[in-house]
Amino acid sequence: MRVIIIGAGMGGLFTALALRESGVFKSIHVYEQTRTPATAGAGLNVAPNGARLCKWLGIDLDGGDPKGPSGAIDGGRAAILETTRNIGPDGVVSTNPIDHNTSANDGAGFHHMHRLDLLMCLHKRVREVGPDSGVDCPIQVHMGKRLNSLEQHNDVVTATFEDGSSAQGDLLLGADGINSKVLRLVWPETPARRWTEVTCYRGLIPRDKVAALRKADGSPLDHNPIDSFSMDSRKHLTAWAMNYWVRGGELLNVWLAYYEPNAAEFEGDEGDWFSADPAEFQEKMNKAFIGDPRRDDVTALAGAMENPSKWGLYDRDAFEHWHEGRIGLLGDAAHPMLPTFGQGVNQAFEDGAALSSCFKLHGADVQKALLHYERVRHYRASRFQFSSKFAFKHLEPEDSPQRRAILKAANERDYPAFDHEDRAGSDMNWIYAYDARNVGDKLPAKRLGPWDFRPHELTKAARREVALNLWMPPVPLMGDRTVTRAEVALHNTYDDCWIIIRNKVYDFTEWKDRHPGGPYVARMFAGKDATAEFGEYHSPLAEKHMVHFCVGELVAND
């Protein structure tokens, strides 16, 4: 069989390598719209669940010289960090070892890398199995190929590009990111990407420059990253500063995010990122951390960044299906997520590994393999996709007193909409010990909703106590009418909020400030269908309570 992959980013190249391992395909062609590999971005984390998959495919994250004989970056040289440091506003530093640096044979440590280094690692491995290598099932990468249209029949998919050329395959995979053209062509009704109202600056500082950092008054930093091979985090009410080493400790990656709902440049379609003025960035952080003793350290880091860029953080509501006929999606095209879990690239790698196993299991039965892939991946990827949204919630205005009362009654944050570090349980094996190659030998049942990804320690009795004390409307709705999607779409604001869950329409307008998930739920899903993200969330007791907010049954538009 022949494979077409749209997008030669990290997910696309990894998936090409993974599909070779299935033994099912004769050739793999990857098409990329840019003429040269993209260089935008700074640091990222290949976590254990992604690193072990890289080792499986012979992708060397640790070796090599980041600058080859010609002086061009060719990948390698990850930074294997030792600890995380949370630097609090009171000056207290809590340090935790970075575990899951498992046995050397596993290859499953945390690898913090420059994005370009990782991309070049992937390109290097792909070249080793290219058309001139003489291997079975070669991978060929075609640059400068911008997708224009798709057409599929029972036995073939045809991709046509803007230069007039075309390609045919038995399978086509969209690995073309959050702005996926494959997604728009095949699923035109999918929700558009959404700016989260969080802006971040990214940049790199050479090691010698980090060592020389000083506060504005010339004194040393309170916590200079040069003193610790760690990932440092400084959270504030409306901002979050993080830094960690990449390229074997040669560069410090600096990442600073802040809540900026009025940043007009990210509300349209102008782009995802822009070059930034270091002085502007430094001033932003100076204001964000005003009155905070960590401000001098943060502004020093901001001012030292070389060629920083300004990024708008976008996501998209989960949608139910990732495949149609012989066409499938992976990575950010299927499940774009914010960077709070450090799992974006790792989930794309997991997609590729699962696809390989599904085709190894089902052979030339493309639709069955894609359905199996969707079933094993949708539920897990949705966990990260949804939860990463809420990990930025601390940058927004404080929760309502009513919601805080609910949390106090529960005595811990048991709901999936809460900041991930505050949830019950601390076992991270569900993230890092997971092996995406294990897809089972039978088609799994369909599951919706990312709701059980840590062990819950809250007792059933305590949960029942919380549910029984949820706020009730003075006049419950009757739920005895029919509602169209067009009507629901009219109620799409924070102050007039209807939401669809499993073909029922609920009015969250009065309920939102008292909802355990917080008013953020209303802001994200007003006027929309939230079934793909909430489908299996609510318990029977919660559903009994929701009846009081039910407008009626969803019907097709007239």
Language-model region placement:
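Extreme N-terminal starter segment of soluble prokaryotic enzymes
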Residues: 1-3
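A short, Lys/Arg-enriched amphipathic alpha-helix followed by its capping loop at the start of a domain
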Residues: 15-26, 53-56
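B-type heme-binding environments
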Residues: 458-558
